[in-house]
């Protein structure tokens, strides 16, 4: 599933070029749909992506909503326009937006030290801000880079256990010195959303983004509940 973002990037670039004639009426709808099918198939083959769902909208007109390939390879379940996919690290966009929403409400400050929200976090001599969590300049080691995490990844670790896992690691660099992608930083940012809002991360996203924007098929991923039309892989 790690190829999904690459496939999406290829498609966005290709579709932008394909839709340009549509604005002037140069291509008829049938030819346009055939071209989109061709682009999707080529991108899936190039990235070895088993399944994908595509929606194309142009100036308010829904041109296409369609699934390609398989949502479940083992059981040969086809992907449709209703297939629900895990979005992985795209979740960080929602986390950052949630933090910024709380900044607008005066409940969070980007330049505030993280110890304001996590008093027991071992920052040592460093000063780490909320903003540095969001822009990957905190220097906190990413837990996905740690063998110890993968050894326990199937366990239902508590927030305290997760923080203990990566907070014990040496800093990768002095905070603010450079950029380095860190899932740990965004783990803390997600917890900050809960602390500042007084709601669970899932509740805050539902109330702030999903429901107001009509994102009826967007969910927070729990291991227990059944999600209709969820892709497997």
Region locations from a protein language model:
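Short, glycine/proline-biased beta-turn/loop segments that scaffold the active-site neighborhood
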Residues: 110-124, 211-213
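Bacterial N-terminal signal peptides
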Residues: 9-18
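Bacterial N-terminal signal peptides that target proteins for export
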Residues: 1-10
């Amino acid at each position: 599933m790690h190829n999904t973002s690459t496939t999406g990037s290829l498609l966005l670039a290709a579709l932008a070029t394909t839709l340009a004639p549509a604005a002037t009426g140069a291509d008829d709808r049938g030819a346009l749909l055939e071209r989109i099918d061709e682009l999707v198939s080529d991108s899936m083959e190039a990235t070895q992506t088993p399944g994908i769902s595509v929606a194309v909208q142009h100036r308010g007109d829904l041109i296409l909503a369609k699934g390609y390939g398989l949502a479940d390879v083992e059981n040969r379940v086809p992907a449709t326009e209703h297939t629900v996919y895990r979005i992985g690290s795209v979740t960080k966009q929602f986390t950052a937006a949630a933090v910024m929403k709380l900044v607008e409400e005066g409940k969070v400050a980007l330049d505030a030290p993280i110890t304001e929200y996590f008093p027991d976090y071992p920052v040592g001599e460093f000063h780490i801000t909320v903003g540095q969590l969001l822009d990957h300049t905190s220097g906190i080691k990413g837990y996905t880079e740690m063998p110890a995490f993968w050894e326990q990844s199937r366990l239902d670790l508590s927030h305290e256990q997760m923080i203990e896992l990566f907070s014990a690691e040496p800093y990768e660099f002095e905070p603010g010195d450079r950029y380095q992608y860190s899932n740990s930083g965004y783990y803390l940012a997600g917890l900050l959303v809960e602390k500042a809002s007084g709601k669970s991360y899932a509740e805050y996203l539902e109330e702030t983004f999903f429901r107001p924007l009509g994102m009826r098929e967007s969910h927070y991923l729990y291991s227990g509940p059944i999600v209709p039309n969820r892709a497997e892989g």
